[in-house]
């Protein structure tokens, strides 16, 4: 398959993957159905717990049954979960819908990246991965920005309309996946040997024993934890006394997040060429942490800091995926990427739990500053471990 064909199919997949219509309103639906903040907190924890627990099994299934089938299942299961939210009325029914939503996401997590990398590699153009994935992320983020703004308005007309529309869009996403070619992912190997769980465990161990890879994954997982706890408190911070935005402006703010992140994603390959991956991870995440550290002293910097955070994270995520892909054997690629995603989920749970306690004890802005300092210390150690090893491009790894 030629680069242009892979690229446009991936862009269409990214476009129909967006769930922007429900991003700014799904918590409002929970409140409208009479759920308490305790119930909402429980559902959020349940969602992340399912993400973490399902990552390895669904990643393994993705490698076992093929990436196209895994992505097809992801679209259908996610559509069912999102549609279920429209019908849910009780805590149990919301829990079941969110569980389906999370499981669907884990079927996609890592698998879409693994498919893209393999499809490009089969055509001898694996070096285009950063460019294509970055542009694909930009397409998705731009679509999310537009639909987020629409979703806020649509919600005022119909409580459930955004959920039904996203479920329909995900059905289109499933149809797009069916147009993907099947990419060889190592299934020509003996199934009696290659797909044993013991073999998978051995190959996962081998992947994470490569020089610097554990430290690098730890660095990016720690970064994700900081990003996730910040995202959790965006709405109470910007609507509260410290910033004072009207509630109606929050949808526009979320659209701004996605527009800026889309622009940054589109420039990922240029950042790689001009700045380099090593310098990016030395400067970008530390700039993010520094912007959070100053918030208790300069609350006016809150909105720019949150916008900048989204841009920095999306570029970092693409580079993370590229580095892990480069150093992972083809037939276990989705499984390894799912392990990385699982690590991010664990960090998200930990940061959110600690962040909630600290926010009640001090204040949300001071909590973010304290956790940003924790990140600076931890990332400094991990970056020292990875520097000079994992950031070296190894073409032999790419071809495996």
Segments (PLM) and residue ranges:
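Juxtamembrane intracellular "pre-TM" segments in multi-pass secondary transporters
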Residues: 1-3, 178-219, 240, 400
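Pair of pore-lining "gating" transmembrane helices in MFS-fold secondary transporters
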Residues: 1-35, 99, 209-230, 307-311
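A single, central transmembrane helix in multi-pass transporters
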Residues: 22-23, 39, 159-164, 206-264
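Transmembrane alpha-helix termini and helix-breaking/packing motifs in multi-pass membrane transporters
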Residues: 32, 91, 144-166, 236-245, ...
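Helix-to-loop junctions at the C-terminal end of transmembrane segments
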Residues: 54-66, 155, 263-277, 359
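C-terminal ends and interior cores of transmembrane alpha-helices
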Residues: 76-90, 95, 286-299
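Cytoplasmic helix-loop-helix junction between adjacent transmembrane helices
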Residues: 98-142
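Multi-pass alpha-helical transporter architecture, strongest
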Residues: 171-180, 350, 367-400
